[in-house]
Amino acid sequence: MIRTIQTAEITRNIKEMCIEANHFLAEDMEHAMKKAAEEEKSELGKKILLQLQENLKIAGEEMIPICQDTGMAVFFVEIGQDVHFEGQWLEDAINEGVRQGYTEGYLRKSVVADPILRENTKDNTPAIIHYSIVPGDKVTITFAPKGFGSENMSRIFMLKPADGIDGVKNAILTAVKDAGPNACPPMVVGVGVGGTFEKCAILAKKALTRPVNEHSEIPYVADLEKELLEKINKLGIGPGGLGGTTTALVVNINTYPTHIAGLPVAVNICCHVNRHAVRTI
């Protein structure tokens, strides 16, 4: 049975999500930050982690953005195949929600209309939107504002199959080491392995939205996530890049089938302000 959803409802939810995600960190991230502060071995590192927690508290209480970089708006939109939209074009409705959220929420407008000419759009649109069709009659929207301090430190490696699992590990560790303090650690490391050039990048981006306390359902991948987190935290980059035992809070890896001649690996790094909001309509 077809279910009709008014796109005005999409716009309203998008607006609220833009404001919510930029002022409040998800519970799993807050818990991870507290745990990191308790376990950090460096006194300076511990002090920095406590300051970051204080920043989160002030942001929520005073409705000030957690970070001045309120990001480029990234959405994953899962649309039930039994959904019919009425109103304006869905993509316009999403961008209108971003426009309203970033304007009414007094969030920084960080998007330029052309990558070379660099004129600001003044409303943080257009958003980056990834659509997928799923069974059912609901729409699930995941919003992830992505700051570019960490985005600029992200990498894609087109490995050869012969590079194998060791090549994958080395690629991930290389990306984190190269990022160093520039990604505002402690980091959240999203990894995509497989697919094609663009698919592995989307896998890595989606990995950043997975809750910190959830590992991959594939046993060997879950083991790899734990192993890499341990190795990354032995690099000594630490909170704020000033040394310590907490360089990353989590490593999330998504995989996908790939071509017999390829082994694509994407590493999408996020800072400690790994913001996201999810709503189902």
Model-derived regions, located:
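Non-transmembrane, aqueous-exposed alpha-helical and coiled segments at domain scale
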Residues: 1-191, 196-281
